[in-house]
């Protein structure tokens, strides 16, 4: 019995929900707003649910860009995998949909802060990002056991170019994970947003060089739609 209790304690203490137990609280109001939309909006069971960060939330032309699909937007600005783990069930379980698409791009940003006169890196490691991706997947599978789940690659941007190597490695880890698991798919985008000079193409972004402009979204939609067409039977 003691051994069993120890195993249970060890499992709970190692859970991402415990490790990042404080990260979700600041987003509670945003999640409640999204839940309110679930009560007001109606969709068919052929819809595709999009969850993630501001690139989802700000995608005003999503219905036009994904014309043959029925998108549901449930993104909130600044989302990280370390906070979306707290809300995955609430964002996903109410929806009977054809597929789920995820774009979360804020766990590796290059931001630092000073603590006791020392500079501290606030980013997660690529391997930690992968752990959270796996956790999110398990949460989704509790209510949607076999549904296709698409992970959209984090886009290369000038704003975060200094940490692109880390972002790229995290992308590679997630892609490799999807290839080994049934009904998980990875949407590669990086090559479309890199210019001939090997740098991010700023013509596809707004002034902050982080978020997509209309042209960037149109391209994003084309890439995503092609992946849906390939992997989802209409």
For the regions a language model picked out, list residue spans one by one.
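Catalytic nucleophile-elbow at a beta strand-turn-alpha helix junction centered on a G-D-S/GDSL motif
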Residues: 46-61, 79
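Catalytic His-Asp segment of secreted/periplasmic serine-dependent ester chemistry enzymes
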Residues: 155-234
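Structural recognition of the beta-strand scaffold that forms the well-ordered cores
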Residues: 48-51, 72-75, 99-104, 148-153, ...
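Second-shell loop/turn segments in exported
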Residues: 73-77, 120-126, 159-164, 206-210
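Active-site segments of SGNH/GDSL-like serine hydrolases
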Residues: 104-109, 138-169, 190-191
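Oxyanion-hole/transition-state-stabilizing segment in secreted/luminal serine hydrolases
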Residues: 56-65, 70, 83-130, 155-158
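Generic structural signal for well-ordered alpha-helices
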Residues: 88, 133-138, 171
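N-terminal secretory targeting modules
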Residues: 1-50, 64, 231-234
């Amino acid at each position: 019995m003691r051994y069993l209790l120890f195993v249970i304690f060890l499992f709970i203490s190692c859970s991402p929900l415990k490790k990042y137990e404080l990260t979700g609280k600041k987003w509670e109001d945003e999640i409640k707003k999204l839940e309110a939309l679930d009560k007001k909006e109606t969709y068919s069971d052929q819809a595709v649910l999009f969850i993630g960060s501001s690139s989802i939330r700000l995608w005003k032309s999503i219905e036009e860009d994904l014309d043959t699909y029925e998108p549901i937007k449930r993104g909130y600005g600044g989302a990280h995998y370390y906070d979306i783990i707290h809300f995955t069930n609430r964002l996903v379980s109410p929806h009977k949909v054809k597929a789920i698409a995820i774009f979360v791009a804020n766990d590796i940003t290059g931001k630092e802060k000073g603590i006791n006169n020392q500079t501290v890196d606030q980013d997660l490691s690529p391997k930690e990002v992968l752990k959270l991706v796996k956790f999110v997947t398990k949460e989704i599978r509790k209510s949607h056991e076999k549904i296709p789940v698409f992970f959209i690659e984090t886009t290369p941007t000038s704003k975060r170019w200094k940490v692109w190597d880390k972002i790229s490695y995290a992308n590679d880890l997630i892609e490799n994970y999807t290839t080994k698991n049934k009904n998980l798919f990875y949407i590669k985008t990086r090559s479309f947003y890199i210019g001939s000079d090997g740098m991010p193409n700023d013509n596809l972004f707004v002034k902050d060089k982080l978020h997509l402009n209309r042209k960037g979204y149109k391209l994003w939609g084309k890439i995503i739609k092609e992946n849906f067409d390939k992997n989802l039977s209409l």
